[in-house]
């Protein structure tokens, strides 16, 4: 579609805008990139690129910038995920060589590391909680009025809930209740727990535990919270530091979105397998018209369980960012699978 000369000039425009965020004309492009063409030739070829819709003129300058269509062509046909440089690879290798004993901390720290490497906002979608199976739980009294309810799933997820101990409850009541629940509920999915607690467990608790009605509310609320989908952020406000976000209303709306974790989960829950890039208006969200999103999924023991989202400006350094997300997906899969298998033994 494009000649070698047009491709070279187009790449130079992309590279210029990635690092300067400024429109560029033929004279500056020639001076900056030392292209082997005259200014007139570059100007003519830029005219062709504009006719194709790959670059466009801004309102405030006579120079040109890449368009969404141009970025789409660039990502689809002109680049591959970049092989990580030594410092990136070393940081990731060092991170994943640590010993991790629970899934939640590993995923959260992965989100933080990805944002540190990119200076963009990273979002990791946790495994679908309702498919997790209960491995066991503990009820640890803190004082006469409060206790910590600790739920552990088969995928290494640990959920802690500070709960109020119902009035008149004794330690022996708590011990009996924990034994009953562990006996009846271990191995069930969190989704099934919603059914089992009000049906079978309620009757058992009524026979063996005083004031069991209050316990029912405590456990029902805790299991409901544990069933919520988990979203882990790294650099939540990094995207707002980009020059594209100078509109205070857009900043406010984006901050509000980031605070609604379940909305964020629904926004990205259906990301496809493999490394994917959505650019600008392809995101079908007015808040993200100036953003590009790179996504990948991660697995545990061959089963897809979560997603990785990197949110940055449309002028991002795509090859490096795609390389980082791709490596993160594969390495996180390996470590989570090992953690899962260790927990099965």
From Swiss-Prot:
One of its GO terms (molecular function) is DNA binding. GO terms for biological process: negative regulation of DNA-templated transcription. SUPFAM superfamilies: GAF domain-like, Winged helix' DNA-binding domain. The keyword Methyltransferase does not apply. The keyword Repressor applies. Gene3D superfamilies: 3.30.450.40, Heat-inducible transcription repressor hrca homolog, domain 3, Winged helix-like DNA-binding domain superfamily/Winged helix DNA-binding domain. Keywords: Repressor, Stress response, Transcription, Transcription regulation. InterPro entries: GAF-like_dom_sf, HrcA, HrcA_C, WH-like_DNA-bd_sf, WH_DNA-bd_sf, WHTH_transcript_rep_HrcA_IDD. Belongs to the HrcA family. Negative regulator of class I heat shock genes (grpE-dnaK-dnaJ and groELS operons). Prevents heat-shock induction of these operons. This is Heat-inducible transcription repressor HrcA. It comes from Listeria innocua serovar 6a (strain ATCC BAA-680 / CLIP 11262).
């Amino acid at each position: 579609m494009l000649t070698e000369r047009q491709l070279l000039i187009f790449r130079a425009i992309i590279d210029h805008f990635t690092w300067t965020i400024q429109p560029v004309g033929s004279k500056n492009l020639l001076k900056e990139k030392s292209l082997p063409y005259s200014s007139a030739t570059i100007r003519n070829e830029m005219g062709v690129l504009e006719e194709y819709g790959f670059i466009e003129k801004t309102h405030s300058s006579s120079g040109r910038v890449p368009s969404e269509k141009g970025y789409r062509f660039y990502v689809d046909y002109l680049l591959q995920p970049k092989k990580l440089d030594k410092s990136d690879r070393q940081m990731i290798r060092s991170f994943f060589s640590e010993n991790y004993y629970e899934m939640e901390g590993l995923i959260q720290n992965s989100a933080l590391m990805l944002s540190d490497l990119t200076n963009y906002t990273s979002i990791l979608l946790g495994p679908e909680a309702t498919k997790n199976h209960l491995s066991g739980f503990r009820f640890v009294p803190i004082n006469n009025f409060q206790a910590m309810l600790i739920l552990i799933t088969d995928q290494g997820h640990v959920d802690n809930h500070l709960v109020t101990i119902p009035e008149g409850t004794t330690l022996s009541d708590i011990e009996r209740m924990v034994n009953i629940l562990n006996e009846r509920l271990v191995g069930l999915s969190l989704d099934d727990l919603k059914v089992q607690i009000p049906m079978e467990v309620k009757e058992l608790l009524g026979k063996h535990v005083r004031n069991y009605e209050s316990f029912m509310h405590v456990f029902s609320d805790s299991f409901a919270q544990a069933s919520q989908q988990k979203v882990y952020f790294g650099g939540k406000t990094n995207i707002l530091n980009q020059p594209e976000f100078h509109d205070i209303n857009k900043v406010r709306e984006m901050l509000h979105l980031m605070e609604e974790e379940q909305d964020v989960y629904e926004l990205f829950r259906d990301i496809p397998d493999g490394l994917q890039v959505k650019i600008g208006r392809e995101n079908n969200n007015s808040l993200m018209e100036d953003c590009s999103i790179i996504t990948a999924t991660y697995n545990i023991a061959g089963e897809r369980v979560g997603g990785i989202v990197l949110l940055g400006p449309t002028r991002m350094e795509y090859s490096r960012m795609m390389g980082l997300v791709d490596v993160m997906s594969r390495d996180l899969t390996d470590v989570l699978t090992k953690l899962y298998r260790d927990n099965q033994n």
